């Protein structure tokens, strides 16, 4: 059975720049104008990351465009947004990100089947330059293989 997800924004660069070791789903605290803007699909999580401050986790650098009809009640486009996670998940994140080289990256933002906005986070370790070259070679080889199969 496939789970319903209406994707709002994806961070495709994260899969290229990081080794994703674990994925988590988190809720996100938003204002009304932000929700309306997300319903129109006006969001970018390309440069966003999450970090812990005390016993809370916040999403930084996530761009949600202003909603035109919100007038003076509009939101700041790049404000830090609190993520909603269970205490055990927060403790796991804090423990893993304390290790050198690990970070918390936003992978995708979507509406779940109950129409709630969720964000998929990845506990990730950065790739070195040679790892990136290797993944490019792998991708090219798979593309060439599919071309050869189609030609036969």
From Swiss-Prot:
The keyword Hydrolase does not apply. One of its GO terms (cellular component) is cytosol. It is found in: Cytoplasm. GO terms for molecular function: RNA binding. One of its GO terms (biological process) is trans-translation. InterPro entries: SmpB, SsrA-bd_prot, SsrA-bd_prot_CS. Its main location: cytoplasm. Transmembrane segments: none annotated. Keywords: Cytoplasm, RNA-binding. It comes from the Bacteria. Belongs to the SmpB family. Required for rescue of stalled ribosomes mediated by trans-translation. Binds to transfer-messenger RNA (tmRNA), required for stable association of tmRNA with ribosomes. tmRNA and SmpB together mimic tRNA shape, replacing the anticodon stem-loop with SmpB. tmRNA is encoded by the ssrA gene; the 2 termini fold to resemble tRNA(Ala) and it encodes a 'tag peptide', a short internal open reading frame. During trans-translation Ala-aminoacylated tmRNA acts like a tRNA, entering the A-site of stalled ribosomes, displacing the stalled mRNA. This is SsrA-binding protein. It comes from Rickettsia bellii (strain RML369-C).
């Amino acid at each position: 059975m496939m789970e319903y997800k209406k994707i709002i924004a994806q961070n495709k660069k994260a899969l290229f720049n990081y080794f994703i070791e674990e994925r988590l789903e988190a809720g996100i605290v938003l204002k009304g104008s932000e929700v309306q803007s997300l319903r129109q699909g006006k969001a970018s999580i390309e440069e966003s990351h999450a970090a812990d401050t005390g016993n809370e986790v916040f999403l930084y650098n996530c761009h949600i465009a202003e909603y035109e009809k919100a007038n003076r009640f509009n939101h700041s486009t790049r404000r830090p947004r609190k993520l909603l996670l269970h205490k055990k998940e927060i403790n796991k994140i804090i423990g893993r990100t304390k290790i050198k080289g690990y970070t918390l990256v936003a992978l995708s933002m979507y509406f779940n089947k109950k129409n709630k906005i969720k964000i998929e986070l990845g506990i990730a370790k950065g790739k070195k330059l040679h790892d990136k070259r290797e993944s490019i070679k792998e991708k090219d080889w798979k593309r060439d293989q599919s071309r050869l199969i189609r030609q036969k």
